[in-house]
Each structure stands twice: as C-alpha cells, then as structure tokens.
Amino acid sequence: MNILTNAEKRTYGAIVIGSGMAGGWAAKEFCDKGIKTLVLERGRKVTHNEDYPTTLLSPWEMEHRGQLTKQEIDENPTVSKCYAFREDAKHFFVKDAEHPYIQDKPFDWIRGYQTGGKSLLWARQTQRWSQLDFDGPARDGFAVPWPITYKEIDPWYSYVEHFAGISGNKDGLDSLPDGDFLPPMELTCVEKYFQKEMKRLYADRHVIIGRCAHLTEPRDIHIQQGRGTCLGRNLCQRGCPYGGYFSANSSTL
C-alpha cells in the first residue's frame, strides 16, 4: 500500500469513486479543467494493452476453446447469462458466489470490478434518445416528467460522440436522432437485401445500421488518445489492443 505522508501531495480538488464508464468520464472532465483528481477503484488495476491476456489468442490456444465448463455455468447462474462471459473474458467479471446480493425482485446484476469496470465489456450500441422518449411520462401518464428536453441535451450528445467516436449513418429519423458520427459500419449483403425488401414492403419501417462506439475512420482527437481503427475482430470483450472501441481504459483514463 502506498501511503502519502505529504499533505499537499494527498490533497485533491476532486475524488471520483469508480473508474468505469461514468467514473472515467468524470475524471477526464475534471483533469481537462486542471483539477487535481484522485480516482478510487475497488477492483484490480487493468492497464490498457498490458492486461488483456487473451486478446490475441486463437480458440485452440485456450483450454476449453473459449467456452465455459458446466461447473462454471452452474456456479455462476447470473453472470453466465451475459454473452461476453466466456473463457476469453471471464477474468473481467465478478463471479456470483464471490459477491452475492439479495434480490427482492428478479434482477441480473452483471458486474466488473477492475480499472475500466464494465466499459471493457459493454455492447457499445449508442443510440440517442429523442424528444419522443423525453415526453414519455407526460404522454403516457406514468412516472415523473423529465426536467430536460432533447434540445437541451443535444449538444452534450455531440460532445460525447465526438470524443468517444461513434460510427453511424445519418438516417433522418425523428425517433432516433442523428449525431456527430464517423462513417457507418457496412451492412452485410444479407442485411442490405433485408433492408431493401423492408423498404419495398413497409415504407414506414426502417432498417438501419446500428450506431456504435467503434472507430471506422479515427479523427485527430482519437489518434491523440492512442486509438486506431476497429478491425472488426468481434473479440471486443477481451479488451481491444487497437483501442478500436471506446472504453475508460483506452480513452478517458
């Protein structure tokens, strides 16, 4: 344990609890504004690139070819529901037996206790809310009305999208607003055919490419973070050595 005895060195303008998606961004904002910031994380340290032990492994290089054993599934009935909880990424997840919790109602709590938290494991889909969503409580007569409007949060969406790097197509849909996008991922030939047929048969139904936090054409702001183009490996949950997707480890921290 490193204990600082100098009062000046252990005095901070801001303390952030947790180093995941929200904590990493909060720390970035404080530091960008010149505030000396301390980030506290309950889990182990995971350094970008250095601590992604399976990122370049092939299935045959893993004992169970990337799959879980029956014992692991039985011992982790909750976390094993997550698509990314497999042999190649299980070290980034909290195991059920090690951190049990009380469920008054069914709730699958998927957790990751390490630097970066679940920003290493998220599915990276980043659709904006629209005014339709913000109007939901008033329109449908439930819950508490939102104290903000889409118009107010729109520039903040753009601020985050520009820094994080969100790819997507500008589809002009009121229900799914466009943003500050990098070029979109390309649809497969099957998806393009499906899109064409849906447009022919159902003019009011739109098939679009998802807006996701993957760098298709990195801008200077992403290159300055040390990040590169997404290679489409579909192994993101292992940690990306290229920084192709947004995480606290590859970006904000």
PLM features: what roles do these ranges have?
Residues 31-53:
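Glycine-rich FAD pyrophosphate-binding loop
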Residues 1-11:
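A short, basic/flexible loop-to-alpha-helix module at the beginning of a structural domain
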Residues 22, 44-45, 120, 126-127:
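Short, glycine-/Ser/Thr-/acidic-enriched flexible segments
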Residues 52-68:
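Acidic, Ser/Thr-rich peripheral helices and adjacent loops at domain boundaries
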Residues 63-70, 75-93, 98-108, 113-114, ...:
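Conserved redox-cofactor binding core of oxidoreductases
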